[in-house]
Amino acid sequence: MRVLCFAVFLLSLMSFANSAYSTQNTIATIDKVLVVKSERKLHLMHRDTVVKSYRVSLGKKSGPKQYEGDQRTPEGIYAINWRKHSDNFNLSMHISYPNAKDVQRSQESGLPPGGMIMLHGTPNDEEYPEWFFNTLDWTEGCIALTNPDMKEVWEAVQDGTLIEIRP
């Protein structure tokens, strides 16, 4: 009986070690984040293959970001360039908006492009449950995930990773 219990223990331990190893390998292989606004999806990518997908919430207004304060989520190619722990939204990762095209459009329109577009979790709000925020577009132009999903993305995506935001 002891031998059987020990064998079960060893198998469990090996299974845990394997899952931890494969998670670390998956995390190390994310080379792109793809957001498809029309699908409300964020995809973690490795060599053009989707590794994992998440539902997201976007800016309150549809269409590409035009100027500061328009409550739209930008569209284009950017990078995740820094991260922080946020008092309001738990974990957050900065998206390098505006890019050169955004700056050019801004100069042509005479309106500031804005900035501080983040990939972040849901608010620390006692009045509304977390699932509520994942059912609608509520941000000022950022991309929001549930806090557990944001934690996974935080662990999987390195600073400097490309993020493409499509319509």
Mark where each language-model region is.
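N-terminal post-signal-peptidase region of extra-cytosolic proteins
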Residues: 21-31, 58-82, 100-105, 128, ...
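Residue-level detector of beta-strand structural context in well-folded domains
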Residues: 31-33, 40, 69, 91, ...
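Intrinsically disordered, low-complexity
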Residues: 20-64, 167
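Exported/periplasmic cell-wall-interacting domains
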Residues: 72, 82-167
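Well-ordered beta-strand positions in beta-sheet-rich domains
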Residues: 32, 53-55, 77, 116, ...
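Short beta-strand/loop turn elements enriched in aromatics
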Residues: 5, 44, 129-130
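Bacterial N-terminal signal peptides
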Residues: 5-15
